[in-house]
């Protein structure tokens, strides 16, 4: 009886470790990559790439993504944060359009990378890209 109980406990621990490993593997596979030299975001699993607006201060590195609710105007109710520095949250969010003179919707469609480097460090994406990003866990900025 004791042997069976020990075996069951070992199997349970093994299954839990295996499940945990599978979850980690899955989460790491749900990665997006931003290429700052191209001002482009690519989904690692599907290889789909999309233009983005970025800034000269957009931090490089590997970050976990976290969905945040916000009531601030222009963000559509939420943003996907990836790095906090003092009072500033670097985030992926829908194209911010509250300052029409910045022409962000026009600039994100531009084939010129220089036109798409203009934010304060956040990464702006089209609405449909943003909705898809909610299913991803890791951001790598190169």
Regions inferred by a protein language model and the residue ranges of each:
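Intrinsically disordered, low-complexity
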Residues: 15-62, 141-142
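Sec-dependent N-terminal signal peptides
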Residues: 4-13
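Tryptophan-rich substrate-binding surfaces of secreted polymer-degrading and adhesive proteins
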Residues: 1
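Exported/periplasmic cell-wall-interacting domains
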Residues: 69-142
């Amino acid at each position: 009886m004791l042997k069976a109980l020990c075996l069951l406990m070992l199997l349970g621990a093994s299954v839990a470790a295996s499940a945990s490993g599978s979850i980690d593997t899955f989460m790491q596979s749900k990665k997006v990559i931003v290429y700052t030299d191209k001002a482009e975001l690519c989904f690692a699993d599907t290889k789909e790439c999309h233009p983005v607006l970025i800034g000269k201060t957009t931090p490089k590195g590997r970050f976990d993504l976290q969905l945040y609710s916000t009531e601030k105007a222009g963000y559509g109710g939420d943003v996907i944060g990836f790095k906090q520095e003092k009072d500033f949250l670097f985030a992926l969010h829908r194209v911010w359009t509250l300052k029409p003179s910045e022409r962000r919707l026009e600039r994100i469609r531009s084939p010129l990378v220089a036109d798409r480097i203009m934010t304060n460090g956040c990464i702006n994406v089209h609405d449909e890209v943003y909705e898809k990003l909610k299913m991803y866990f890791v951001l790598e900025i190169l």
